[in-house]
């Protein structure tokens, strides 16, 4: 049974019983809700216009292809509100990461998020972006950066190192080895370990927060991932691939509270030009 099948059966059960098991439902990370999951949530709400509360960020949509919520009976038009105060990320990191996204992002039903008026409540050092000659030089640079952060008082478990996909994890391991600080690879539980750096893929970074983050291996054909580009069938799919890959880098960068380092090897990802400019 697939995840979609499971939610489909549960939705049918809720409808058949006629009385939902909950009066209200709160949904976080709503930008990545899938079709079957939304059908289930719609069944929970029945005819209560205030039965569902969604919190999400279209700029962090990294899993789900866009689709119409309205077509599934969930209408949030005119009922959404954009949160504009950022408590997690410094002004400098947020402002630079925002260069990866357009000023306004809209969903399929026309609901738009205007990101231009967002403010952070604290300042910090400017992010560092480095394009290195090869992966050995990159590992040395990131290793030195980790040592510098620890010298400033950042604890090892407050430092995360992220890469696009599993094949690039070896570069994160190499950087951790250069720093001389032990590291833990994040798994399904996505838990940090006291006294150890955290390394993992960008998809595992969502929902986490670190005082310092290094985003490595931002190379050409790695970000955006060449395999995804080659697999698309038309221009619309290609645009969506580029958007989700941008969102993925945005998510990784905004896991940093105070310090952000972004690195790549020549030729670097085209997205780094957006971060720099």
Show the residue positions of the predicted features:
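Accessory N-terminal region flanking or inserted into the helicase ATPase core
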Residues: 1-23
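Conserved helicase motor core of SF1/SF2 NTP-dependent helicases
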Residues: 17-184, 188-197, 202-233, 241-243, ...
